[in-house]
Amino acid sequence: MRILRLLAVLLIAPSLHAADWNAAVLAAVRSMPTGGGYSVTSETSARLRAATGVGADNLRISPAIARPSYCSGATYLVLLKALAGAQATGALQLDPATLQALAPAMQRDGQGAWGRWNANGPGTARLFHELGVGRNFTSWEAARPGDFLKIFWRDAVGSDERGHSVIFLGVENRDGVESVRFWSSNKPDGYGEKVVPKAKIARALFSRLEQPERFAGIARVPAVDPYLASLLERRSSFAEACAKSGVAVPR
């Protein structure tokens, strides 16, 4: 009987572990300020960098400094807050060099952790796939609150895309219209939730944080991801973005 109980725990543990990280992401969202305005300028990026510091054994996140804000910066702060919370409780142990590598820096698209996250196309998904910190997928049915989500407002990836980096909160019916609720920095108000008709979303690429301890491998990946770096000037496709992110190409 004891062996059966142990097997049950081992079978359940992975799903609980994954669910806990979604909960950590949602807790980080709840701790974020609201409003502050939306802006994409060099000053906004400087405020994002100023909002994050590295101590002896943890990140120091002050999101109120990062206002106004933009979408990728907002979701990256949520990721860092989730990691910092786990680091503070001992659930995660990343060394100072890794923490420093994760802090936002003056990086071009595709460079380092932040430069990958902030890039056009599948920035978050590509980073997750490269480091093995979580899985990427396109199924709305598989999505759970606390998943990271890259929304593509039209079927274009790269230099001509229109995208939005968000935290997925769920699908709901609003006045008879199937709608998607998410959190991010949204135009024009900044930090907060938003609901949009699902039909307005051309493509969706989800990323679920599952093994954040693998962020320790950031020092071993190439300094620049050439695919992400290229998306400032060239067009890609959703099929290519999925292939680069370890996702089966949707039909």
Language-model features, listed with the residues they occupy:
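Surface-exposed intrinsically disordered loops and tails
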Residues: 50-57, 125-137, 205, 221
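Sec-dependent signal peptide recognition
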Residues: 2-9
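N-terminal capping segments
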Residues: 17-118, 236-251
